[in-house]
A protein has these predicted regions:
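Redox-cofactor binding/interface segments in oxidoreductases and associated redox assembly factors
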Residues: 17, 149-151, 274-276
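N-terminal FAD cofactor-binding segment of flavoenzymes
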Residues: 25, 29-83
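Predominantly flavin-linked oxidoreductase catalytic cores and closely associated redox partners
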Residues: 29, 118-245, 263
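A conserved beta-strand/loop capping segment in the N-terminal third of enzymes
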Residues: 60-121, 127-129
Length: 392
């Protein structure tokens, strides 16, 4: 066993290695609860969280913790493919947009007033679990703690395994401002599959904030990322399709989110719990992260007050298997995504779909959603996935 002297190291009750969405949500809720004032908490991240580096969206019925960070809401959304368009009435849900900097400011404006919480702008280089404590090294310092919450994603480890399919939700987005009023600020474009599919699952995603301003993202659910030029060429073509001739690009963003049912929680140990994408908090079948992380962070804060073993935190549900079925299909036949999502949204109740994606539906409601999907595809996926029942 490696022995590391902690004579000159500062010790914390909790260290968060990586301070992304999941870590910040969790620490914010720990502070809000008032139950952790006697616990010292350290957040470590190489990023200062002072730029508008990403956009999150989520749906909800009632107002929640992140209301101050929401910059735009929609009661209506558009779903489209090459053959049809459908206006989706989302009520009682609202579709919400959160810009990264607004979220960071909300969290840090609160937690940095807490005497027991520290944020250090350092890159984590090593994590070690010892007999009586855990150890974290950065490029310049070392720390010890009772428990580590790690959100640094092990990309190589996940992608090198072959048991579970791994796709990516990857995209480039442009925030643009046009000279002409061309957007409907009351309606988001949830998925527009009318773009050429090219053997993949490809769609445009449009979030208008005014009649002249919108975020347009070219998004894929597939295995391989594209060259930057291909994403941007597709965005340009879509802008032309909308009839926009004069516009300026205000900001750009890009991302790649793993979509997999890999059992991240099997790596949980006595003192280290993976959270966020590294812990399987991303919704595997869609890549949505904000709502799932909101739920999981609340569950974790409640869990920590029960003095239980970290390995008891995660519980696998029926939705894990549902996600696995879709990923199994897209892994084998990536070109079928538009067909599957179109079958769900063409005539289905969008509020029931949202409830299903939130993992809040009954078995009867599950059947209402799943029965709209191409039956033969899912029967074959079930047959291919029978081996997973051994670990379900």
């Amino acid at each position: 066993m490696i022995r590391i002297s902690n004579t000159n190291m500062k010790h914390y009750h909790y260290i968060f290695t990586g301070s992304g969405l999941a870590a910040l949500m969790t620490v914010y809720k720990m502070a809000k609860s008032g139950k952790f004032k006697e616990k010292t908490i350290l957040l470590l991240d190489e990023n200062q969280k002072k730029t508008n580096d990403r956009t999150w969206c989520f749906w909800q019925i009632e107002k929640g913790d992140w209301e101050p960070s929401i910059s735009k809401k929609w009661d209506s959304a558009l779903f489209a493919n090459a053959d049809f368009q459908r206006n989706l009435d989302l009520q009682p849900y609202q579709y919400n947009m959160v810009q990264g900097l607004d979220f960071y400011n909300q969290v840090f404006d609160f937690i940095l007033h807490e005497k027991n919480i520290s944020y250090v702008n350092q890159k984590v280089t090593d994590i070690n679990e010892l007999e009586n404590h855990a150890y974290v090294a950065t490029e310049t310092d070392s720390y010890t703690c009772d428990t580590i919450f790690n959100s640094i994603y092990d990309k190589e480890g996940v992608e090198n395994q072959t048991k579970y399919p791994v796709l990516q939700q990857h995209f480039i987005g442009w925030f643009i401002k046009s000279k002409e009023p061309v957007f409907n600020p009351d309606q988001a474009t949830f998925m527009d599959f009318s773009v050429e599919q090219k053997g993949n699952t490809r769609f445009m995603y449009v979030l208008p904030t005014s009649t002249t301003e919108a975020l347009l993202e070219y998004t894929l659910f597939s295995h391989q990322l594209l060259n930057k030029e291909e994403y941007e060429q597709e965005i340009k073509q879509y802008i032309e399709k909308l009839g926009i001739q004069n516009f300026e690009i205000i900001e750009k963003e890009k991302g790649s989110i793993p979509m997999t049912c890999y059992l991240f929680w099997n790596k949980t140990t006595k003192r280290v719990l993976n959270i966020g994408t590294a812990g399987g908090w991303t919704k595997a079948s869609t890549g949505y992260t904000f709502k799932n992380s909101d739920k999981k962070s609340s569950q974790l804060v409640a869990f920590l007050q029960q003095d239980r073993e970290l390995k008891e935190f995660h519980t696998k549900t029926k939705f894990w298997f549902y996600d696995l079925l879709l990923l199994n299909i897209l892994d084998k036949h990536n070109e079928l995504g538009a067909r599957i999502f179109s079958s769900i949204f063409k005539k289905g109740d969008p509020t029931l779909v949202f409830k299903f994606l939130d993992e809040e539906t009954s078995y009867f409601e599950d059947l209402q959603v799943i029965s709209r999907c191409p039956q033969l595809l899912f029967i074959k996926a079930i047959a291919r996935s029978m081996r997973y029942f051994l670990v379900f």
